[in-house]
């Protein structure tokens, strides 16, 4: 007897993507999701629904749908960037709408020659990423382009942050700090290179219009292979890069382009689709198509005298064979690499609940590995130096998950009996020089 599920039945049982896109705001305090009939906004942690906007079909314009394919918030303000998407887009895919939720209307409209891939907002500028270019405008009722169009590789990764120059200066000069707008993107001319620029350094020529203004950029040779992903930290001092190979993650200084850290995700090739710095820049979270979440330690503490990270105290795990294989010409390079301090192989909690149904295991696994999520870090208002919890929001399954980074218990396997006054986790029993070990634990999850 054939007990296999019919192909048509398996196809019909596939879950439709819950969200068309997910994006966090500038400080990860909120995230927005795009839907086939509008968009929603949630508070990141604790998870609460803040806004739900539903668009209805137009009685006068039958060609106008309700789908929103992309959203981007401006901090926690009433301004939200919208791009059409879905089966019946509300707007064209090459049109950017700035929605004012306070006035309940569209306040700014920008049209382009190609589809919009990403949008970044600040109180000063609007940065629009297209298929092969970047266009930058003033944030005003009638937006004006502030510099020439920037060329990037097809579907190149771009990141943009607004920060204060005090993060790049000593305390003696912090009184004269100013606002910086750092943008990073892959070079269109040289493979493996990225360009970093500060929009506040745009130079205008009185004899030329603003569109011909010069934007000074610095070039960083990051990888040999094409750039896959570029991410800036919130302070604008570091930029993380990875190539299409997906084995190495490198972190550079945006100030002088020097290499700060190099981390190894793994040995085999992977598609890294998400990276995110922690609020104070001490850690970097990385996700690939293998659905393994890695946490890399960039530095441990901040030097309070200069307000700069202490990279000398950074730690990370090493390969188990590093201390057993002597250095030589035949020793693989990856043995000397710095690995993540902890990682977790992610699983969809809804699919896990149906593991007893063996007929659906393959379908569930395939759906999960095709799913993509965004990372947002949680920050304790009472202790802003503590970066130990983060949130994942999955696009297709609509799952919200919170993970925490915990120190592993150091147990002496040779000791099985303890006195009444002795704790199982006594810091005094920790061996001198023994590295601290960490683990990622899922604290909670919820279906949105």
Swiss-Prot record:
One of its GO terms (cellular component) is cytosol. One of its GO terms (biological process) is pexophagy. The keyword Repeat applies. It is found in: Endosome membrane; Prevacuolar compartment membrane. It is a peripheral membrane protein. InterPro entries: PROPPIN, WD40/YVTN_repeat-like_dom_sf, WD40_repeat_dom_sf, WD40_rpt. WD repeats lie at residues 222-262, 267-306. Keywords: Endosome, Glycoprotein, Membrane, Repeat, WD repeat. The keyword Repeat applies. Residues 416-435 are annotated as: Disordered. Gene3D superfamilies: YVTN repeat-like/Quinoprotein amine dehydrogenase (2.130.10.10). Pfam families: PROPPIN (PF21032). One of its GO terms (molecular function) is phosphatidylinositol-5-phosphate binding. Glycans are attached at residues 61, 155, 256, 280, 315, 421. N-glycosylated. Belongs to the WD repeat PROPPIN family. Contains a beta-propeller domain involved in specific binding of phosphatidylinositol 3,5-bisphosphate. Involved in piecemeal microautophagy of the nucleus (micronucleophagy). This is SVP1-like protein 2. It comes from Saccharomyces cerevisiae (strain ATCC 204508 / S288c). The lineage of its organism: Eukaryota, Fungi, Dikarya, Ascomycota, Saccharomycotina. The gene is HSV2.
